[in-house]
Amino acid sequence: MDTKLVTIDSSSNKSGVAWFVNGIYKEHCLLNCSRYKNMDERFEYMSKEIWMALNEYKPDIVYIEETVVLRNAQTQRFLTRLQGVVYAWCMNHNCEFNTIRPTSWRSAIGMKQGRNIKRDQLKEQAVKYVLEKYGLSVGDDEAESICIGDAVLKMFGDVGV
């Protein structure tokens, strides 16, 4: 039986989703809701898009990037609520739900991080990693979702495969 893993790099504008089967990367998608300027509309749209992606991929295991404390409380609430939407999907579909800290997944795949490494540099590293490993030219949201998947597989083996 196949083991399906979905990894999510969520944000309030664009979220990357990656799909792995039996420990092998299969595909990714970008959920873009940046056209919605109102945060409540954006949340509803992003929630529905993530729900549809989960329905399509039918994962056994989900890893979503843990929300980190931000200066923007509105964005923090958005991401925390979005995590709840993913958790609810998992509960309703007998799917294992997990979060992973950005520092953990970056460390697992050998990314340089620390006080002197800026956010944009971290995103560039993710894009470069995916280009070098998979030959894919993707944006940072998709890249980070793929990186999260690779890190999970490296940290925990083939997660049920």
Regions found by a protein language model. Give the residues of each.
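Phosphate- and other anionic-substrate recognition elements at nucleic-acid/protein interfaces
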Residues: 1-161
